[in-house]
């Protein structure tokens, strides 16, 4: 799941020596599986260990990972690098935001990945989001808008000129995109 280099283990062991006895480290992801995911490392005193945590035992320490973060920390690496400018702890977690789907994955998964990794981060600037509801047998992607996009007067332009063009360019097997949302204009609407 997580690889911690020898130099990082030595760095953590040095820090842990100044903490309450039995304190280890916790590796976690805030907002896992989203474009806003952030990884972190913190102290984990003995009374903060949960029964559902995964304990990863290393030579010099134990790293605890909570149940929600665990799948997003696959292939994560923690290293402690020293160069002429100083020392730096690095944490690389390539799956924290969302796992990249393979090119031969089912169309539904590939479309969902595009929505979550490229389209929704753009819509989030307006407080909006879009969800894939289904892909019909005749190749139509059925979407539902939420947040600031619901009731927005520009939603048709966003759908046709933005989302549909991008999706049809990326997935030639799609024939079009349709909006399933029952739009209700309100204070939540962006325009």
Swiss-Prot record:
SUPFAM superfamilies in the record: Fe-S cluster assembly (FSCA) domain-like (SSF117916), HesB-like domain (SSF89360)
Single GO biological process annotation from the record: iron-sulfur cluster assembly
Keywords assigned: 4Fe-4S, Iron, Iron-sulfur, Metal-binding
Note describing how the cofactor binds: Binds 1 [4Fe-4S] cluster per subunit. The cluster is presumably bound at the interface of two monomers.
Residues holding [4Fe-4S] cluster: 149, 152
GO MF annotations in UniProt: 4 iron, 4 sulfur cluster binding; iron ion binding
Highest taxon listed in the record's lineage: Bacteria
Classification via Pfam families: Fe-S_biosyn (PF01521), NifU (PF01106)
Cofactor field: [4Fe-4S] cluster
InterPro entries: Fe/S_biogenesis_protein_NfuA, FeS_biogenesis, FSCA_dom_sf, HesB-like_dom_sf, NIF_FeS_clus_asmbl_NifU_C
Entry's family note: Belongs to the NfuA family.
Subunit organization: Homodimer.
Free-text function comment from the UniProt entry: Involved in iron-sulfur cluster biogenesis. Binds a 4Fe-4S cluster, can transfer this cluster to apoproteins, and thereby intervenes in the maturation of Fe/S proteins. Could also act as a scaffold/chaperone for damaged Fe/S proteins.
Protein name: Fe/S biogenesis protein NfuA
Taxonomy of the source species: Bacteria, Pseudomonadati, Pseudomonadota, Gammaproteobacteria, Enterobacterales
């Amino acid at each position: 799941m997580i690889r911690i280099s020898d130099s990082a283990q030595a760095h953590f062991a040095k820090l842990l020596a100044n903490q309450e006895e039995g304190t280890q480290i916790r590796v976690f992801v805030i907002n896992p599986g989203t474009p806003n995911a952030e990884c972190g490392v913190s102290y984990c005193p003995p009374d903060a260990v949960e029964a559902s945590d995964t304990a990863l035992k290393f030579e010099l320490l134990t790293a605890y990972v909570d149940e929600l973060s665990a799948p997003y920390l696959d292939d994560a690496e923690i290293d402690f690098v020293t160069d002429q400018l100083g020392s730096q702890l690095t944490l690389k977690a390539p799956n924290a935001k969302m796992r990249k789907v393979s090119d031969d994955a089912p169309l539904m998964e590939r479309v969902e990945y595009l929505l979550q990794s490229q389209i929704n981060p753009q819509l989030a600037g307006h407080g909006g989001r879009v969800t894939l509801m289904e892909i019909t047998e005749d190749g139509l992607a059925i979407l539902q808008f939420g947040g600031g996009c619901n009731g927005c007067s520009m939603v048709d332009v966003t759908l046709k000129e933005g989302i549909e063009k991008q999706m049809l360019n990326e997935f030639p097997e799609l024939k079009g995109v349709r909006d399933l949302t029952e739009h209700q204009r309100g204070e939540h609407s962006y325009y």
